[in-house]
């Protein structure tokens, strides 16, 4: 019976290898096959523990190759799968962030493993502005600019001026964002609503002036909840704009235009950038007027999944796992 079990497993492994094109040599590093101890209480093998995450043989092998030796040894010796293994069930979990996931989960035990991975990937286990990462591809439509990702002072995208019918001031956007905004504004007009730009591109120096004005008025702690520091503003990308207003006192969220945008912005490639209930992820208060162009595919996924841009980026496959 034991030989039959081994034979069946070998055939299954051979089929998996043939289908994936993975070489036997690539799998030498992961303990494969059923445990010699077939009793009900037998410790699961590393392969079994990884496959229990829903990974294929190829995916399990690739993940095993990324694990540092102490983590591998923990799997070899475990009578039960270690808790940190639950993070790796998600293809957006980074192996080199396992220590951070564990530490953050200890500090936030109420979170699920998925929430832990997403929030650490966003950077929430570290204070904002403390060690920002430079935005590597500032021209990307989904470039993440926030309290953890900074644009260089001299970054200026390609920009075009908005026609007077679509703005209340002389202003600029990236060409692709402007074209999409025109289509969206025209569609809203067909429904009897007017949406227009109130504030679009801001240079580094302009954002510096805006932020310092708020700091003088209310202090840095308060300003940081609704105004970006210079270099940390999406407005510098030329992909963000404030629609119809940029004031909390106007209560844009109560307008018909806001309701229309919530339902339709994604069709044109825009997302509500700082939604209500996601302040702990974005770092900013709810801003019903602030929209960001990310392209139709990303915008629709964010709308369908109720994700912020932070969550969208945090859920992209980790290196070696796509």
Indicate where each model-derived feature is located.
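Extracytoplasmic cell-surface/polysaccharide-interacting catalytic and binding patches
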Residues: 22-199, 204-322
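Sec-dependent N-terminal signal peptides of Gram-positive bacterial secreted proteins and lipoproteins
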Residues: 2-25
């Amino acid at each position: 019976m034991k030989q039959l079990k081994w034979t069946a497993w070998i055939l299954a492994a051979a089929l998996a290898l043939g289908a994936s094109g993975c070489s036997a040599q690539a799998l030498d590093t992961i303990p494969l096959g059923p445990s010699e101890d077939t009793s009900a209480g037998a410790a699961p093998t590393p392969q079994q523990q990884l496959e229990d995450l829903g990974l294929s043989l190829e995916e399990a092998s690739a993940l095993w190759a990324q694990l540092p030796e102490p983590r591998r040894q923990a799997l070899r010796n475990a009578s039960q799968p270690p808790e940190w293994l639950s993070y790796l069930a998600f293809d957006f979990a980074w192996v080199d962030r396992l220590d951070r996931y564990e530490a953050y989960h200890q500090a936030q035990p109420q979170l699920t493993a998925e929430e832990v991975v997403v929030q650490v990937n966003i950077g929430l286990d570290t204070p904002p502005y403390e060690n920002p990462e430079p935005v590597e591809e500032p021209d990307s439509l989904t470039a993440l600019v926030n309290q953890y990702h900074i644009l260089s002072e001299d970054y200026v995208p390609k920009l075009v001026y908005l026609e007077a019918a679509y703005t209340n001031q002389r202003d600029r956007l990236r060409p692709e964002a402007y074209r999409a905004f025109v289509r969206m504004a025209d569609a809203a007009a067909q429904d009897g609503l007017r949406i227009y730009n109130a504030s679009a591109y801001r240079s580094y120096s302009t954002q510096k002036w805006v932020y310092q004005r708020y700091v003088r008025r209310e202090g840095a702690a308060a300003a940081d909840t609704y105004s970006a520091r210079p270099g940390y503003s999406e407005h510098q990308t030329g992909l963000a704009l404030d629609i119809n207003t940029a004031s909390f006192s106007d209560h844009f969220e109560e307008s018909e235009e806001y309701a229309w945008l919530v339902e339709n912005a994604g069709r044109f490639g825009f997302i509500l950038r700082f939604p209500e209930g996601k302040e702990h992820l974005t770092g900013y208060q709810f801003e019903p007027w602030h929209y960001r162009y990310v392209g139709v595919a990303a915008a629709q996924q964010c709308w369908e999944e109720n994700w912020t841009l932070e969550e969208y980026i945090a859920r992209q496959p980790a290196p070696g796992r796509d």
